[in-house]
Each structure stands twice: as structure tokens, then as C-alpha cells.
A protein has these predicted regions:
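A short acidic (Asp/Glu
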Residues: 14-18, 78-86, 313-316, 420-430, ...
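Helical catalytic core of nucleic-acid polymerases
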Residues: 136-139, 155-162, 277-398, 402-403, ...
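C-terminal, non-catalytic extensions of nucleic-acid polymerases
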Residues: 274, 426-640
Length: 640
């Protein structure tokens, strides 16, 4: 099916909707040079047109087997506005519905508001749609800012009763831009998300239109034939160990720790195997030391000991699958097929599609069982799986330390253990892995790590065997992309993080890295106000303030007359200001399309020292070095 993007703008006496169809050549659409030409193909419908309702419904409903109607947050807003127009409401009534969506408390403002209230939750029916906010968060403007698009907004007051032709033209211009932004965001980020959903539909015989309209979790529930159910043990806390792992766990974990996990859901931290080990709803996490550097050498090596498909495996081996799935064999068959296809040579396209579908089902099922709004909801089985996973993996970590001389656990996470061990003892580690697998039926993998700079369990830089660099956490996040996820991260002056990574991994001079970087996006930072704040201002050096958009993109400027950016709210009758975190003291807005800037001109205003000083902050760490079992302080990574 083809994608038809749309977006509404609503004012007291006038509404507007823009439709834009995805070009047949998607590479043409993603090339920003073609943005003006693409926008020229968009169709405008507004309430001034004598047959506006019929035109709107025609574009929404005609050829519904050909076009998927797509947009951002359309379930919560645009489809509701479309339904209000479909009901024959006049622009004033459509605005009331709009206001109730945005501020539900306004439903009690007038009798007409009360009458319109039920329609603030009713979507237009009988169409196939894809909401780009599904399995995501944040606003469209945030996505536009991160992707480098123009994030300027209309200055027209949406509560203005009598719009001029210039006002309408302005709203039309920005509405077209948001439709193009949805198209661009789909191609850059969400296309793979939709493709994966369609793969599930193809494999499990789910109608294509249902695939578009469902979130991943809802679609997986359909694939597994799950039926929402209630269970008498929803409030039960205590869990019991499966017979096959009971002896192993009690032999390799202190009984007090094991029973605390088994009989309580409260998070707690203990010291085991020289780690601070934290147990909680997010799984088990531990570190040997924060701010730790370790590298492999001829005698010692870093080794990742991972449980393969840990949570899907536990759902099968420990019988933790949501009981809303009437036939557990369906899940096991999917798991077995994925393993078989993973090792198959010369895969066909159908094999690849099956792999995609199987992976999505396996990786979504556990999390969906803990969401009370989903058909897979089974809270007892969800907490049981999580806590069994913590117990069994920690038991292995404890046994490794007790049985392998000198082995150090560098960190544990939800499905793996990073250990530092003598190379001659690797066969013993593998033997203990095999024992763990034999007891449980869960396979284990391992891979070699060359180096790790570990700030804490959630922030580290790692070089794997072969030179592949892995980053986790915000400390050295250097891209908006999140591989394996269809989410994007804010811009945080990536130039600094990239320079630090090059310094640590290659020894490249930080200043040289910063100066040589000509990617304008790497110098940008995004900042937003958040729902609890009323607005955003920039306060200049002379004390004046200028109101800004809710979401902005900035960089560090040499111009000292430029000031900080603040978000503000009313607190006990007074305005309360808070500085935007991690934003330059003197910053300039860069809310226009980043491709419209000339970097040679841009760099004349760029305060390079800000980014160099950020590097200093990122490297302001007293590193510990674990070398052949000995721990010492090292200054080998000092730069400043």
C-alpha cells in the first residue's frame, strides 16, 4: 500500500488539512533538494471551500485499499478532528473538539463544550492508518530538530478568530512543512518499523491494514492468538524456582539473597563477587568499579558471557509465557524456527522475512506481558520471569568467581556477564557455561572484548574483537541513531563525544578532531521545555528576554551579547525560571533547515572552545586500571 501523509491545523473559524502522497521513488523524497517540488504536489483542503467536508472524506476514505493514511499522533488528534468534520460540525464546533483534546478540563467551559465532549475521543472509522507516534514518544518538532529539518513555527495565534489571507497562507506553509517532515521521518526512521510489522502480518496471516494500525505488542498478541484474561495470582508476590534450576541456584547464591528476590519485588543492592549488585524490576545490574579501564593482553582477556535470547528462552524453559497465549507451542515453534533459520546458509527472501517476524515476536512478548493495556498482560508471569532471570544469571556469576582463579566480574546486565580472566582459564569458563546451559536448556554465547572504558553499568565505551566500537549511555553518545530501535536521541553536541572517542581509541588530538569536523549537526544541541513548563525564553546579556519556540536547536556562539536559554513556569503566583541543561552560556538559534547553512560562514561564529571544554568535562575522570588482576590509578587518558 502507498503512504498518504496528512496534518490538520484548527482555529476558531477556520480549519485546514494538507495531504501529501509518498512519491513512487522514495530516494527522490529523501533528497532534501527536492523538498519544494514535493510540497508543490500536496493537496490543501480548508473550511472556506464549499465542499470541504466531501473533499476531505474523499481523500481519507476513497481508495482505502491503496493508501495508508499516515501522520504523527493522528490517533490522539488528527483522526479525531477528521471525525468531527465527518459528523458535519462547523469550524467553531471543530475548534471546541480541538480544545478539549488539548485541554480536557475545557470540556466544562460551556454547554456546547459538554455536548462536544464525547467527540473528543472518537476517531474517523473505516480507514487504514499508520500513526508515526506508535511505540515512540516526543513531539514531531523534536524529531524535526534532531533530523536537521526546519523547525520554525507559525506566528499566527491559533485562537485568533478572524484570520487574514496572510495568516491562512502562513498556516498553510507550516502545515505543508509538517506533512513533509512526517514523510521524511518515516523514510529516515520509521520505514523499518512498518516493514517489520508487515513481515509479521505476512507470516501469521494478519490483514495488512491491521498491521499498519497495530503497535508491535498488539500485533504480536494477534500472532500468538492471545486472548485477554484475568488471573487469580495477579497480586501474588512470591515466586518458586523451577525444579531443574532449584539446586543450582541454592548452591551458588547466598540463601538470604535468593529468598529476598523470590519473596519480594522491592529493589535492593548487595555486595557479591566484588561487585555492587542491584536487583529490581529492570533486571540485575552490577559493576566491579566505576571509572574502570580494562584491556585484553597476551595473558588476560575480557570475555562477554551472554545468555542467547535469554528472556524468550526463559518464557519456554521456565514456563513463564503469558497465560493469555492459549497454545504455548506456537511460541516455541517460532523460537525453534528462528534458531534454525539463523544457521541456515543461502537464505531466501521468505527466510529473511520470517526471521524478521520471528525476532519481533520473541523480543516483544515478555515486555508486553507487563503492560495492563495489552492482551498479553499477565503480571505474575512477567515478574516471575524477570526475577528468575536475575537469580539464575547471578548464580552463574557467583560460580565463575568461586571456581575460576583470579576471574573478575567487570559488570553484569540483564542477559550477560563481562568477565576478565586468564586466557588459560577460558576452557573452564566455557565448561561452566555449558553446565549452566545443560541445567536450564538455555544456550550461551561468548565474544571477546579488546578494551572497555566503564563509567558505570549504563555508560561505557567498548572495543570488541576486530575493532568494532560499542557505546552505551549518554556519556559518549555520538549519533541520534539507536541501532536496533526505531527511536532517535537528542542532539547533544556530538562533536565533543566524537573527539573523545577518537582520543581514547586512536589517540587522536581532541582539538584537531574538533577543528576538522565539518558536520554542522555535530555542533548542535536540541532543547525542549517539557510538559510542566509554560514556555521558553532567551535572556540576553543586556537583560532583555525573547520568547522562543517550545523546541529549539542551538549552538555555541562567539557573540557575547547572546544569552542563556531558560524554561519558565508559574509557581505560587510568580514566574519561576530554570536554565536549559548543558546549553552554552552564549548560544545562537539554528532553527532553520541545517542544509541551508554554509559551514564556512557558520564556523566564523562558532565558539570552538565550548566544545573543547565539553571534552574536558567528559574526560574529567580519575580512571582505575585493572591490569592482570591488579587495580591501580592511571593517568594515561588525561588530556588537560
Amino acid at each position: 500500500m502507498k503512504m498518504r501523509f496528512f496534518d490538520f491545523e484548527v482555529t476558531p473559524n477556520w480549519w485546514l488539512c494538507i495531504f501529501g502522497d509518498m512519491p513512487d521513488d522514495e530516494s527522490y523524497a529523501i533528497d532534501r533538494v527536492n523538498e519544494p517540488a514535493i510540497k508543490d504536489t500536496f493537496v490543501e483542503i480548508n473550511s472556506d471551500m464549499p465542499n470541504a467536508r466531501d473533499l476531505l472524506i474523499s481523500l481519507m476514505k476513497d481508495n482505502d485499499d491503496v493508501y495508508v493514511k499516515a501522520g504523527y499522533n493522528i490517533k490522539g488528534y488528527d483522526l479525531v478532528i477528521a471525525n468531527a468534520i465527518y459528523q458535519g460540525f462547523n469550524p467553531q464546533q471543530v475548534k471546541i473538539v480541538n480544545d478539549i483534546i488539548i485541554n480536557p478540563a475545557s470540556a466544562y467551559d460551556t454547554k456546547e463544550h459538554l455536548r462536544m465532549q464525547p467527540f473528543a475521543k472518537r476517531r474517523l472509522r473505516g480507514i487504514c492508518y499508520q500513526d508515526l507516534l506508535d511505540d515512540n514518544d516526543g513531539s514531531l518538532k523534536e524529531k524535526e530538530a534532531i533530523l536537521g529539518l526546519d523547525i520554525m513555527e507559525s506566528e499566527v495565534d491559533f485562537n485568533k478568530e478572524h484570520l487574514t489571507e496572510e495568516d491562512k497562507a502562513d498556516l498553510t506553509y507550516y502545515c505543508k512543512h509538517d506533512v513533509y517532515a512526517c514523510m521524511y521521518y518515516f523514510l529516515k526512521v520509521m520505514k523499518g518499523y512498518v516493514k517489520n510489522k508487515l513481515a509479521i502480518g505476512k507470516k501469521f496471516g494478519i490483514a495488512e491494514r491491521d498491521c499498519y494500525m497495530c503497535t508491535n505488542a498488539n500485533l504480536v498478541a494477534k500472532a500468538l492468538g492471545a486472548k485477554r484474561s484475568s488471573f487469580g495470582d495477579e497480586e501474588l508476590i512470591e515466586i518458586f524456582l523451577p525444579t531443574k534450576i532449584r539446586e543450582y541456584c541454592y548452591e551458588n547464591l547466598p540463601n538470604k539473597v535468593l529468598d529476598q528476590i523470590r519473596t519480594s519485588t522491592k529493589p535492593f543492592t548487595v555486595t557479591m563477587f566484588d561487585n555492587e549488585v542491584s536487583f529490581g524490576n529492570g533486571g540485575v545490574h552490577s559493576v566491579y568499579k566505576n571509572n574502570l579501564y580494562v584491556e585484553s593482553n597476551d595473558e588476560w582477556m575480557l570475555m562477554n558471557v551472554d545468555a542467547a535470547s535469554y528472556y524468550p528462552s526463559m518464557l519456554i524453559q521456565f514456563e513463564c509465557l503469558s497465560r493469555a497465549v492459549r497454545n504455548p507451542a506456537v511460541f516455541k515453534n517460532i523460537f525453534d524456527e528462528r534458531i534454525a533459520l539463523k544457521h541456515k546458509k543461502n537464505k531466501t527472501q521468505d527466510d529473511e522475512d520470517s526471521q524478521t517476524a520471528n525476532k519481533l515476536v520473541l523480543n516483544t512478548t515478555y515486555g508486553a506481558s507487563g503492560n495492563k493495556y495489552l492482551d498479553l498482560y499477565d503480571p505474575y508471569m512477567c515478574t516471575r520471569c524477570c526475577r528468575l532471570g536475575q537469580i539464575f544469571l547471578t548464580a552463574l556469576a557467583n560460580k565463575l568467581v568461586k571456581n575460576v582463579n583470579g576471574l573478575k566480574v567487570i559488570q553484569t546486565n540483564t542477559d550477560g556477564i563481562l568477565v576478565y580472566v586468564r586466557r588459560k582459564d577460558v576452557p573452564l569458563v566455557r565448561k561452566l557455561q555449558d553446565e549452566w546451559s545443560k541445567v536450564s536448556g538455555i544456550n550461551m554465547d561468548y565474544d571477546i572484548v579488546e578494551k572497555i572504558w566503564q563509567r558505570d553499568v549504563n555508560n561505557y565505551l567498548m572495543i570488541k574483537e576486530g575493532g568494532k566500537v560499542k557505546r552505551k549511555g549518554l556519556w559518549l553518545m555520538d549519533t541520534w541513531e539507536k541501532p536496533g530501535y526505531f527511536l532517535i536521541s537528542p542532539l547533544t553536541a556530538y562533536a565533543s563525544q566524537k573527539a573523545v572517542i577518537s582520543y581514547l581509541t586512536e589517540g587522536k588530538d581532541i582539538v584537531k578532531s574538533i577543528i576538522e569536523n565539518t558536520n554542522i549537526m555535530d555542533f548542535m544541541m536540541t532543547c525542549k521545555k517539557g510538559p510542566s513548563y509554560r514556555g521558553v525564553v532567551q535572556r540576553f546579556e543586556d537583560g532583555t528576554e525573547v520568547e522562543l519556540f517550545k523546541c529549539n536547536r542551538v549552538y555555541a556562539s562567539k557573540d557575547k551579547s547572546l544569552g542563556q536559554i531558560y524554561k519558565y513556569k508559574m509557581y505560587k503566583g510568580n514566574i519561576s525560571y530554570a536554565k536549559m541543561p548543558s546549553i552554552p552560556e552564549h548560544c545562537r538559534l539554528a532553527n532553520n533547515d541545517l542544509e541551508s547553512y554554509d559551514f564556512n560562514e557558520f564556523r566564523k561564529d562558532l565558539d570552538y572552545m565550548f566544545y573543547i571544554e565539553r571534552c574536558a568535562d567528559l574526560l574529567d575522570i580519575q580512571w582505575l586500571w585493572l591490569n592482570e588482576g591488579q587495580l591501580s590509578i592511571t593517568n594515561r587518558f588525561d588530556y588537560f
